[in-house]
Amino acid sequence: MDNTALKEKRYVGVKETVIYGIANGGQVIGYNLVRMQLTFFLVTVFGIPGTAVSLMIFIMGIWDTMNDPIMGTIVDKTRTRYGKLRPYLLFVPIPLGIATILFFGGAEFLRDVQSTAAKIVYMCITYFIWEFFYTIGDIPFWGLSAAISPNPQDRSMAITSARFISGIIGGLVGPVISVFIDLQKSGKIGIDMRQLFFILGIVAGTFGMALFSLAGICTKERVIQNSEEPKISDCFKCLFKNKPLLLIVCSNVLGTVESIADTFTQYFYLFTLGKASLSIIAGIPGTITGFLAYTFIPALEKKWSSKQIIIRAVIVKAVVSSAIFFIGIKWYRQPTVIVPLMMVWGVFNSVVSSIKMVIPTKMIGDTVDYMEWKTKERNEGTSFSLLTFVSKLTGSLATAVSAALIPVIGLQQVNQDMVLPENGEINTRFLLWAIVTIIPAVLNLLSLIPYAFYDLEGEKLDNIHREIAARREEITKSASAE
């Protein structure tokens, strides 16, 4: 099969593509609560010391270095009539939903408990359970993006659908919490932050997991798999032979610092500008353009390779973020100046974020094809376990660093509230301005270093797709003849 025919033959319809996206939308309600609000929830709402949170996240990071690759190899060894990925997606939504409710209900369940040790124990146990089941669901889900079709365009559309729809559904978490903070401080509502997070946990654990279950119920695996069950040792060997995948992983790790801004954005609007809900106003243009950005990703893929798109996106973000920082450096406490600036910044930031939500995931699918071409074995589970691991690792590192930075930049925890003492020696408001704009974006340029050695693109990648397509045809013909 020539490369043109391979690209033109489509296997996945619009309905299945949309359902795959809706499933991811359900999954990320709980994930975004953890990724964006973990420090705020555990330190400010639950009342757990930041040092304990940082230590737990560090230990969980060590656990993930073993847990994720092991889960990936288990997935790659799975052979059932439902495929090797879908069985996990059929099973995991129920236990993951229960774990989500238990974790975010902790502050409410232990409302009258004074023992910090008891809170820490509850936090560690429930977070471990949540991480465990999240891994069981996340690795097969993203592995499915490479197995849903042999056509790279189908895969790109499935990933784009997942990122687009999850951005809409999961993106509601931040604004809901920002509005609630302002309503609570003004005395307009009668529930507190503990109850809010419990309610959000229930929504994520029931409605969110109901949507996530659609991934196992309504999708198909279409890429032909070797019927022989590989050894766990072989899966690990393939992982370390996959140079393009390891380069993508290194890039993601180096880009960890970019996520720090997520934690401090809430504090910036609350303490520097005086109103948390201003983040919603500032975020409106970016939200719109972020969704629109998904529509022109196919056009970018026609013009540039995936590697070229990523390099350009990271550089643009660094340049724009630096310009915004210096333009607003004299007025960083003036909402009338900063909110419009953050609107402009949000437009560029959201476009770059949309691109980075799709392209690297698609590139991991390319590395799975590369290893099939090189070894005749497909390792979606092992390969995408690294995506899950790195996603959690970078999130955990960012959260741990953020928790450690809170006292360093002058913020203090007083009972259940985060406060900013006036007349301190540290200009906390200015540091928050730098942390949400220039610092993460500039340091993120380090993530481009591994791409200098990445060569799985252009004619090389086209030849690989051509050769494995021919191999699959031969396997199909042989099976039919038998």
Segments (PLM) and residue ranges:
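Membrane-embedded alpha-helical bundles of multi-pass transporters/translocases
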Residues: 2-482
